[in-house]
Amino acid sequence: DVIDLKDKPFIAGTMEGYFAMRMHVLVRFGKWQEIIDSPMPERPDLYCLTTSMHHYAKTIAFAALKQFDKADQEKEAFYASLKCISPNRKLFNNPALQILGVGEKMLLGELEYHKGNYDIAFAHLRESVRRCDDLHYSEPWPWMHPPRHALGALLLEQGHYEEAEEVYRADLGLNDTVPRCGQHKNNVWALHGIVECLKERNGEMEFNKLQGLLAEALSKTDLTITSSCCCRKTVSQSST
C-alpha cells in the first residue's frame, strides 16, 4: 500500500528500493535456485527497480549454473526493464539507473566469466568497481554487494594473486585508494580473500595478523565461507 501512494512518490520510490534489496541477499549467499524460483513482480510498472533486480539476479544465477541460454534471456530482460525506470527515479541520493549500472557490469562480468571469457569478464568487473565507487554515500549502501568481492574472488580463481590482493586491500581500507565510506573494514568476505592472497605469496607476518582477524570474524558467522563471492566455484579454507 505504501509503495502505491500516488501523492508521495519519494516515499513510494524509497520503499520500493528497499523491497528490491532482497535479491542482493540471495546473490550474496549464492542461493541460485531460490533466485530462479522467485516470481517476478506482478506490477513491473510499480515495482520497476525490483523487476530489474530480479533480472539481474536471475542472470547471475543462471550463469553460475552454466545455463547460458537462460542467462542471456535474463540479461536482455534486464536491459528491457531499465527502459521502464524514469531517469528521475532515485533511491535516496543516487539515481536508480546509476545504481543499476553497477549491477549491469557485475552481471556482464560474471556471465562472461562463466562462459570462459576471462579478460572481458575482468574488464566488466573493474568497471563495476569504478561505478560503485562513484555512487554518492548513503545508508544503507545504494549497492549492497561490493563488486570488489566478486572481482577479487574470480581473479584469485584464475591465479591473478597480485591484482586480487590490491582489490582486497582497497576494500578493507588497508591502503588509501578508497574513501572511508567505501571501505568494508574487517569484512569477513574480504578478509577471506586477502588471507588467500597472502598465503599464496608467503606474506607470513601480515598473514598471521589478518588470519587472526578472519578467525574472529568467522566465529561470528553461522555459515561456512570459502570465498569472497559465491560466484567462484573453487573453494579455499583460508581460516585453517
Feature locations, PLM:
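Residue at a conserved register position within TPR or TPR-like alpha-solenoid repeats
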Residues: 26, 62, 112, 155, ...
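Structural signature of alpha-solenoid helical repeat junctions
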Residues: 14, 21, 50, 93-100, ...
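"A position-specific structural signal for the A-helix of alpha-solenoid helical repeats
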Residues: 21, 53, 57, 100-103, ...
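Solenoid-like repeat scaffolds
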Residues: 2-12, 38-49, 79-87, 91-97, ...
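C-terminal non-catalytic interaction modules
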Residues: 166, 170-240
